[in-house]
Amino acid sequence: MPILRRALGLAPVLLLSLAGCSRSDPATDLKTEPLEIRVLSNRADLVSGDDALVELVGIGDDWTVDVDGRDVTGAFARRDNGRVLGRIEGLAAGANVVTLKQGSQGARLTITNHPSSGPIIAGAQLQPWDCTTTDAGLEAAADATTCTAPVLYEFFYKSTAGGSFRAYDPENPPTDVATTTTDQGKSVPYIIRQETGTQNRGIYTLAVLFDPAQGWEPWAPQSAWNGKLHYPFGASCGTNHTQGSAQNVQDDLALSRGFMVASSSLNELGHACNTWLSAESVMMLKEHIVDRYGEIRYTMAEGCSGGSIGQHMVGNNYPGLLQGIQPNCSYMDNWSTGLEVIDCHLLLNYTQNGGLVTPALFGKVSGHQGMSSCVAWEGLFAPVVDPEGGCGASSGNGEYNAATNPAGCRGSVQDYNVGVLGKRSAELWDDSPSADTRAAEALVGGFARFAYDNTGVQYGLEALLDGAITAVQFVDLNQKIGSVDVDFNFTPGRRTADPGTELLYRAGGINDAAQLDGVAIIDLRGTSNAEIHTDYHSWGMRARLDKANGHHDNQLIWTFASSLVVPPSIGELSFVTLDAWLAAVEADTGPGTREQKIARNKPAAAVDQCFTSDASAPPERDMARCATLYPYYGSPRLVAGMPITHDNGACQKKPLVREDYGSVIFTDAQWATLASVFPDGVCDWSKPPQLWSPSVPWLTHDGAGGVALGEPPRSTALSGP
């Protein structure tokens, strides 16, 4: 049955120069503004690829610009929109000092340039790493270290006969090209240009309506592009040490309306389960778009399962990269979701090895509709926690095995994120019961820190209090469930999280939603209680928004009967609604924060609702009725008493007290057993996690823990000869 006991900030950093936040209007009187150099591509300290789109503000007609003494004045001109814009190319690695001079006045700004192959903010890059450019239709990588290859441009079109996109040859154009009318009212031939290239050791793809007979400059984009970007994120959670492949960007719903569609293989969480790497890749790809195609009005995203995690995490931890998101079959983050994966692993092991909680009662202690959800978690994602699950690289020393290949590539999600988590210190290397694991860790100088903790967790507590299981079963379960070590071996005792893993809170690994109120959210919840995409995760994110910000005015939840696939009519309604919502926020020039503008500019359709299986019926907006139509369940930690926020990875403790169990009677022997299982007490869910701290946006992970970037650099004024 559904879980009945539920406990239902920080302002985002202002990113004035962040790529893709908005297009500026031409200045009405440039000479009244102070001289200023503005990098439009990205923050000036995070530029990559040796170039940057730059605006000069407040200048007249006689001025010069140089980069470290190299004259680049010729790159700039007053464009048709009235703004002085130019693309500075040939930036050196590291600091580049840009100086603007006009008479006795001037401005100076340092642009910090990083390689297009990364890294910038996500920390040290993993090794080994296989280049797979030829799988994406590109030439073989010119450099096996950076996996770079020349860009590929292709044209496709929609035929008047319908169907999918077809190859288009500009030298021999077909005669059956369809026409599309964009959301700006422009009717154009339905031809797109698709660009595929390498960036950040991944592979990106982007597509946009494109007339092959016309030019395109970032200060003069072709008119069919509406200036908006649609960004799909990929599903699942995987730890492959390869480039992978990007999402299909031939999205008719978006392209036909004039959107650009873009994504990177590193936004495929099923390929690369590192959300900091995903954010870095979004940032770099958007910078490339601004440099080559022009400023982005706003970016709206979509994605199911792991794709929802990518959206939630990028939106919260790097505010300004995404303005609106459409998470589908959603989760709040991958780290708190990992609690459910490992808890299920332990519960299945307990039940299958003679535990007194039988399969018939399994759902009562797991919080699920039945046993199938944990079985699915075990089959799909236990290998992602197991370092012997494989990392998908053919290069390097092969895959890890504690006994036979201790120096091999470890495929666990924590090892995939070692650049953020850091390594376990030497005093922990003997905490495994496996001699092979202990020897392997000592050989390589420490594995990645492991954040899993189940000390104090009373598995099955709600089931006990509800009378679904007995005191005998409750004691047996908690005595025997045990835990896992850093190599995913079963251990008889409970596990304490490795010291240092509390940095996951600061780094936003466990998503506190503190910055997420600056993002418009339509959560598309296909009801699915028989497998892993259980419904409570949508409501858990709502609870986190409420906890962090005191409201959830920026989040809608739309529930429907199908599980993973959004019905096309609902998908289109969500797309159009989110677009209208963001356009209204963009047009709101009144006072107030972005968060306030999101709350006050909702379209009429931007409300919570559910859709019945009757396609002809109007959506139901009585949420009590929706809860009856689509009940939602929980997780092992919710049954253990954690609030629906599901955000406590390592709980503070309280004493074990008989009175906390109501009418449940324990024998003295049972009580003694519980006391031995919980020597430090049981979880006090009313308190924050151990060593909790709020998330800090815009961290750069050039070492475990991360460093806050702070406000974007701005140019400084110069005066004198």
Language-model features and meaning:
Residues 17-20:
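C-terminal motif of bacterial Sec signal peptides marking the signal peptidase cleavage site
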Residues 1-10:
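Bacterial N-terminal signal peptides that target proteins for export
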Residues 27-304, 308-721:
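C-terminal His-loop and adjacent cap/lid subdomain of alpha/beta-hydrolase
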Residues 22-24:
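Bacterial signal peptide processing site
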